[in-house]
């Protein structure tokens, strides 16, 4: 199921890029997608989104269910990664049950990083 969800999102992104006429790699519609690159000089993977760059964490979390990625999720990914890139941190806020925690966990999973959730209201 994880691969189907990821492939469906990739298909939707490609369709959107074609419809919007994106032809250059420096256009924001392409830059705002989370992409993985191999750095042969360091022999390691890095993730890039907009002007933020992160090393892949290699934290294997299994092949569990993935979040269905929507355009809003893509916007949250850009916002969160830009904040982290600027060393500002990220604290999603909003009504209960809207996917803040799951979106954060999914971004951490895509980056190969561990995500620990603490519920201080219980």
Question: What are these model-predicted stretches?
Answer:
Residues 1-71, 75:
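Extended, charged/polar low-complexity intrinsically disordered regions
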Residues 66-70, 79, 95-99:
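Outer-pore/vestibule module of multi-pass helical membrane proteins
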């Amino acid at each position: 199921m994880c691969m189907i969800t990821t492939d469906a999102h990739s298909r939707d992104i490609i369709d959107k890029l074609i419809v919007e006429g994106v032809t250059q790699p420096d256009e924001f519609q392409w830059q705002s997608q989370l992409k993985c690159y191999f750095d042969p000089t360091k022999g390691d993977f890095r993730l890039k989104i907009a002007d933020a760059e992160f090393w892949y964490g290699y934290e294997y979390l299994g092949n569990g269910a993935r979040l269905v990625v929507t355009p809003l999720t893509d916007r949250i990914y850009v916002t969160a990664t830009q904040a982290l890139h600027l060393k500002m941190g990220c604290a999603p806020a909003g009504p209960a049950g809207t996917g803040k925690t799951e979106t954060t966990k999914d971004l951490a999973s895509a980056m190969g990083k561990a995500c620990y959730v603490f519920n201080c209201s219980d």
